[in-house]
């Protein structure tokens, strides 16, 4: 993603995000707006780097706000979704995650915690926060094939107790 970095960072700034912190040990940046955190990972050999090699510039992980992540981990294990906690040599956040059907990591984040992993892993910078137009994210669209769509529907219904709606086809602007 280094080639796309200048364009992507300009787009993020144009959308109102601020580059607020740098990871203490890795080539990773934290961008924020309101309660939304975007992590831009350019670390060689990382999960994000491998995901980029397979999919190109894309989102490789999501932090999902769930009440009682420990219960979500238990439920994921009961449904045979393997839970990972990252590589203890490189990841210090300790957030549990499962792999989504399209290969992205789905992290379980407790909305009641102040997310101390941000303070533990990142050092703030002096970029001034911009006006916030986005406070939170409540919907995301993911491109996937039909089989992945069926797997995603099952995962979200079984694990998160979400009810599917009718599919929506969105044209690719490229």
For each predicted feature, which ranges?
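Glyoxalase I/VOC metalloenzyme domain signal
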Residues: 1-24, 32-85, 92-168, 173-174
């Amino acid at each position: 993603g280094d080639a796309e970095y200048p364009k992507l960072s300009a787009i993020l700034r144009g959308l109102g995000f601020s580059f607020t912190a740098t990871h203490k040990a890795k080539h990773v940046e934290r961008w924020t707006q309101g309660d939304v955190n975007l992590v831009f990972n350019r670390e060689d050999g990382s999960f994000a780097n491998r995901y980029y090699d397979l999919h190109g510039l894309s989102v490789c992980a999501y932090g999902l706000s769930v009440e009682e992540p420990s219960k979500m981990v238990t439920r994921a294990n009961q449904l045979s979704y393997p839970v990972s906690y990252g590589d203890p040599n490189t990841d210090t956040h300790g957030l549990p995650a499962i792999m989504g059907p399209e290969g992205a990591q789905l992290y379980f984040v407790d909305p009641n915690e102040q997310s101390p992993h941000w303070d533990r892993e990142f050092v703030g910078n002096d970029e001034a926060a911009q006006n916030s137009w986005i406070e939170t994210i409540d919907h995301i669209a993911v491109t996937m094939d039909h089989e992945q769509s069926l797997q995603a529907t099952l995962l979200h219904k079984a694990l998160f107790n979400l009810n599917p709606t009718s599919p929506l086809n969105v044209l690719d602007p490229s």
